[in-house]
Amino acid sequence: LDLEKVYLDNFSSINDLNGNLIIKNNEIYMADISGDFDDINNLKFTVNTNDIGEKITTLFSSRAKPLVKRYKFIKGFEDSGEGYLDFYSSKKDGISKSKLIIDNFKVKEIPALAKLLSLASLQGIADLLTGEGIRFTDFEMNFTNQNKLIKIQELYAIGPAISILLEGYIEEDKLISLRGTLVPATTINRSIASIPLLGDLLIGKKVGDGVFGVSFKIKGPPKDLETTVNPIKTLTPRFITRTLE
């Protein structure tokens, strides 16, 4: 494979896309392909199948926007530096285990999130969804996929306004069941600040006021989701650990 220029859409292209590709039984058996967006940003895609029949797929792009642009609710890459995308997946016997990382992006106009923020009495943050968007600096999702069932072991998104940690499953076109924790950034700061020495080092001795977060459940058919929330007074060690990572 050796292509001088490949257009991903009307605005994005990859230069010097080259590498090796082997297809068996109408599936990619092996791939090692790379290209450049420009002198700094690049893309690399690999597929390797080992002796026990496990297929390992990786995709790294130092520009995430061209790859996620079709998801209309993800915005903001053009505002302040491109975020990157890093994907890893291993598949065997029809079951894939994957990790997706996206860096520095905004989300806009997500009805389920807007309802969750409203129920949590975080209307000011909810208003951002229809305005400039809510920014997340770190996003990671660990999940498995078998047939049409996606199981999310852990999804976390950390941002300057809110942070979210959730788990659950999505059965394509049938049922969504998610549960997790949503916390405003001020609450995270206050909780970390309460840790002796560490809090003073990371946050300082003066911490702004803020509300505690909520635990939530989102369940139902994709077009008829029911959202419930309950206030929380403490953060789990896992949530704080993820925030500090």
Can you annotate each of these PLM segments?
Residues 223-245:
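Gram-negative outer-membrane assembly/targeting C-terminal domains
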Residues 1-13, 18-219, 241-244:
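Small-residue helix/turn framework positions
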